[in-house]
Amino acid sequence: MKAVIILGLVLLSVTVQGKIFERCELARTLKRLGLDGYRGISLANWVCLAKWESDYNTQATNYNPGDQSTDYGIFQINSHYWCNNGKTPGAVNACHISCNALLQDNIADAVTCAKRVVRDPQGIRAWVAWRNHCHNRDVSQYVQGCGV
């Protein structure tokens, strides 16, 4: 009985952690989901963005006390503008999606919403982490050796 309880706790902790992608696994997944070259943005830039926003973690969240919004998922998509968490005052929900959908191991919804974000005038510049860590830098290392 004790072993069953311990196993249950281990499985619960794995479930809560979510998926943390390996760099090349993420590159292949993003390519398959159509981000390579989307709106002129290279695959390496998308992988760089995910590295610095979430460290490739689908379950990453970050609360922003200033506007009471939260950033969700592998791309840290914000609840004030892009998704609905039912808590953020004045939320727009431009992606027409629940923020919880952005925390799934299957990142198809997160990719669809990221595509919506970059269609706005700011494009990929909407992400501070991209501006601080990827913009005007050699980002080829993020896809090097991945065969993509």
UniProtKB/Swiss-Prot annotation:
InterPro entries: Glyco_hydro_22, Glyco_hydro_22_CS, Glyco_hydro_22_lys, Lysozyme-like_dom_sf. It is found in: Secreted. GO terms for cellular component: extracellular region. GO terms for biological process: defense response to Gram-negative bacterium; defense response to Gram-positive bacterium; killing of cells of another organism. The gene is LYZ. Lysozymes have primarily a bacteriolytic function; those in tissues and body fluids are associated with the monocyte-macrophage system and enhance the activity of immunoagents. It holds the Pfam family Lys. This is Lysozyme C. Lysozyme C is capable of both hydrolysis and transglycosylation; it also shows a slight esterase activity. It acts rapidly on both peptide-substituted and unsubstituted peptidoglycan, and slowly on chitin oligosaccharides.
